[in-house]
Structures are given as structure tokens and as C-alpha cells.
């Protein structure tokens, strides 16, 4: 059986990236909550 994690940077950015979050009201709420909580990163790292 194929494993569930098939890394793909473009896919990761498109689904969890900053611009993807800003695009929807729910995503903006996510960023707002993470800012309030004081997270170092608002979105997962895509580029290293």
C-alpha cells in the first residue's frame, strides 16, 4: 500500500501556504488565532 505522505512543495504551499490562508475567511481566522497564540510560524515551512 502507498504511504500517505508523498512530499510535494507546491501542493503544500497551495493548501497550507500564507496566500492560501488569506484567500478564505476561515483561513484568515486561522492566521489570526495563530498570531494571538504567538506562534513563531503562521504557516508550515515550504522552502528550506
Swiss-Prot record:
One of its GO terms (molecular function) is structural constituent of ribosome. It comes from the Bacteria. Pfam families: Ribosomal_L34. PANTHER family: LARGE RIBOSOMAL SUBUNIT PROTEIN BL34M (PTHR14503:SF4), MITOCHONDRIAL RIBOSOMAL PROTEIN 34 FAMILY MEMBER (PTHR14503). It comes from Thermus oshimai. This is Large ribosomal subunit protein bL34. Belongs to the bacterial ribosomal protein bL34 family. Part of the 50S ribosomal subunit. The keyword Ribonucleoprotein applies.
Amino acid at each position: 500500500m502507498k504511504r500517505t505522505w508523498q512530499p510535494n512543495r507546491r501542493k503544500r504551499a497551495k493548501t497550507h501556504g500564507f496566500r492560501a490562508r488569506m484567500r478564505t475567511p476561515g483561513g484568515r481566522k486561522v492566521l489570526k488565532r495563530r498570531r494571538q497564540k504567538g506562534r513563531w510560524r503562521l504557516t508550515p515551512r515550504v522552502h528550506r
